[in-house]
């Protein structure tokens, strides 16, 4: 009996020591202290080899060795994961990577052959980028992704395949690189147009221009090539050349849609040049000439804006009133009514303006450039009533709007009611998020299995990775395997701990908005980098978080249709200009995907815009829509109250409203 008690006590002590070593390993790994993590795991293996093996801790030991660049030890540990283990295919991939780092080509080829054919292409591509030519070629041959096809075409100098790639799709990075490599081999006018379109899609306008010009010499492609040439001049802000080209197109292609479209563009270019009288004449000529057969409704809207900039409000109202007597689409009718109300408000005709704002509130409002939102119509009706001295009526509307503390007009209404915003200091915004990390890990405890004495054959890959707290791989495979067994709350937590903040936002957006879930929906990702950049530029880091959230949802690999890249979504020419002003080295397209560089550029640009415009609304509009457009929008009315309502791009207006809402959410979390 005494011997049994001694034996039981020894087992308990060993078990306690083992668990203590494992806890130390997890803590050290979480702090990136790889040496201490490795030491703790080695102790645990000595204390209880069977339990160590049963809980897949050899896999964790291999990952630790990888971080120490101890590739031989890493491969040894991954080789201990058996074929019937749910982590086997991952272990094979890691052993393959270790073999590549060790320049052991024979072993690497063997491990590559052992990978399942359906193993994720992006992980195979990572090996290809690190491996030597024989293995690289083999990987590319077995993959059909655009990235693999491009790399294979580069290795084989396969010009035809490069052309196929950018003809299939023009707006991704593969297309741009393929077009660059193909451009010296352009053979036909169609090739020239295709290459030019790729460069233009990526805002490489100076590279696009010579290809369009060459293609325009071919009669079969002259119209499209010359029209696109004019567009390139426009984007390069060479407005004089753009007008000349559009005029030549209108003359040489009379009676066609090319003429009609060119004449509309001429009016827009004059507007962009601030040559408002010529713009007025061009829009009037266009409307008279083409009527409903042309882009009449848009021309009328633009013509009214010209009158507003010129201060010719009477002409603007008369143009609107005439148009309202004709058949119009519902959205154009709403836009014109809203514009008329803003003109009347600018003329201090508050009663007439209020009546139209009330009329708009009773409509089913649609989203469009220049259209009102329901909140906007209510806010301006209240503003009109306030100007008329009907303060009670105004405050009743503002109180309703202020119930939504996150919305832009809710915030403005609260200001009108005398409520002051709680200021969040930069220090508060820069506090470390360790408490949140601990809370999220605790929340995931139910997904982690307890220590076991033998491997469970029913376990799945993601569960094993969650137990090992390998959040990066758990987040990756959770989505690849469609791990529906993990609820959105757990999935958001795993993604957050993995630093995949865009996926944390994706899952948290499905959850009730509570104190526990809001930090997952509005993560303070890249916190220290953002705080350092904010302090260097003397800007509020909360604004930077809000801009990143709206621009990319914290996805460092985000790319927009307008060729903007990275966390803070810079287009190439803006990035180069900001980098030069900040004294940074040349920023290549690849560098725009680097979070640190994107944040550094974003903080500098945001600081510059705030200094220039002295208004967060205008600075946000400039960030999204361009500073030159902000000048056009602000010139429509002297009253700054009207600026957001006068933003001419639907996307930019939504952007400004959204960033204010997101900033309020971040501020509420930091109170």
What are these regions (language model features)?
Residues 20-43, 47, 67, 148-152, ...:
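Alpha-helical segment of the N-proximal tetratricopeptide repeat
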Residues 23, 60, 94, 126, ...:
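"A position-specific structural signal for the A-helix of alpha-solenoid helical repeats
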Residues 45-54, 78-90, 112-128, 140-145, ...:
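Short solvent-exposed coil/turn linkers within tandem alpha-helical repeat scaffolds
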């Amino acid at each position: 009996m005494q011997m049994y008690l001694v034996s039981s006590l020894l087992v308990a002590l060993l078990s306690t020591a083992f668990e203590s070593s494992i806890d130390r390993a997890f803590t050290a790994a979480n702090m990136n202290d790889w040496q201490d993590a490795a030491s703790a795991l080695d102790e645990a293996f000595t204390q209880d080899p069977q339990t160590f093996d049963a809980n897949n801790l050899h896999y964790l030991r291999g990952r630790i060795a990888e971080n120490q660049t101890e590739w031989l030890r890493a491969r040894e540990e991954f080789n201990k994961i058996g074929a019937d283990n749910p982590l086997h295919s991952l272990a094979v991939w890691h052993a393959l990577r270790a073999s590549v780092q060790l320049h052991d080509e024979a072993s690497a080829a063997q491990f590559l052959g052992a990978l399942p054919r359906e193993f994720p292409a992006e992980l195979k591509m990572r090996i290809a980028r690190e491996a030597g030519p024989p293995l690289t070629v083999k990987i590319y041959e077995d993959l059909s992704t655009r990235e693999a096809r491009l790399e294979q075409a580069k290795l084989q100098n396969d010009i035809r395949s490069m052309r196929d790639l950018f003809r299939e799709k023009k707006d991704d990075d593969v297309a741009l690189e393929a077009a660059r490599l193909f451009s010296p081999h352009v053979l036909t006018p169609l090739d020239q147009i295709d290459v030019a379109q790729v460069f233009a899609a990526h805002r490489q306008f100076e590279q696009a221009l010579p290809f369009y010009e060459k293609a325009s010499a071919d009669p079969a492609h002259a119209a499209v090539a010359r029209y696109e040439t004019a567009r390139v001049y426009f984007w390069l802000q060479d407005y004089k050349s753009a007008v000349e080209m559009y005029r030549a197109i209108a003359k040489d292609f009379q009676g066609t849609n090319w003429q009609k479209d060119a004449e509309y563009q001429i009016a827009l270019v004059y507007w962009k040049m601030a040559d408002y009288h010529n713009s007025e004449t061009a829009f009037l000529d266009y409307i008279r000439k083409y009527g409903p057969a042309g882009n009449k409704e848009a021309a009328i809207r633009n013509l009214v804006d010209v009158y507003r900039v010129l201060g010719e409000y009477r002409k603007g109202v008369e143009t609107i009133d005439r148009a309202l007597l004709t058949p119009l689409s519902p959205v154009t009718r709403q836009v014109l009514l809203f514009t008329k109300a803003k003109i009347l408000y600018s003329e201090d005709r508050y009663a007439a303006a209020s009546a139209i704002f009330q009329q708009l509130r009773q409509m089913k409002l649609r989203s469009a450039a220049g259209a009102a939102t329901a909140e906007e119509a209510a806010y301006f009706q209240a503003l009109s009533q306030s100007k008329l001295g009907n303060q009670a009526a105004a405050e009743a509307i503002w109180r309703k709007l202020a119930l939504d503390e996150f919305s832009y007009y809710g915030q403005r209404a609260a200001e009108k009611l005398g409520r002051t915003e709680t200021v969040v200091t930069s220090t508060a915004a820069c506090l470390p998020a360790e408490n949140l990390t601990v809370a999220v890990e605790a929340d995931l405890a139910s997904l982690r299995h307890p220590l076991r004495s033998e491997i469970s054959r029913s376990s799945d890959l993601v569960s094993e990775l969650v137990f090992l707290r390998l959040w990066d791989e758990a987040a990756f495979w959770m989505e690849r395997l469609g791990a529906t067994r993990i609820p959105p709350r757990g999935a958001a937590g795993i993604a957050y701990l993995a630093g995949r903040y865009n996926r944390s936002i994706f899952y948290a957006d499905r959850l009730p908005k509570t104190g526990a879930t809001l930090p997952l929906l509005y993560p303070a990702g890249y916190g220290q980098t953002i705080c350092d950049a904010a302090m260097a530029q003397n800007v509020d880091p909360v604004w930077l978080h809000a801009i990143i959230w709206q621009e990319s949802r914290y996805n460092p690999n985000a790319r927009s249709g307008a060729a903007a890249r990275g966390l803070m979504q810079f287009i190439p020419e803006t990035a180069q200009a900001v980098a030069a002003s900040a004294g940074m080295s040349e920023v290549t397209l690849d560098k725009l995907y680097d979070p640190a560089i994107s944040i550094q550029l974003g903080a500098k640009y945001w600081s510059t815009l705030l200094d220039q415009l002295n208004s967060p609304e205008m600075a946000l509009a400039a960030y999204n829509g361009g500073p030159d457009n902000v000048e056009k929008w602000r010139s429509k009315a002297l009253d700054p109250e009207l600026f957001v309502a006068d933003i001419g791009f639907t996307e930019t207006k939504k952007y400004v409203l959204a960033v204010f809402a997101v900033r309020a959410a971040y501020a509420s979390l930091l109170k």
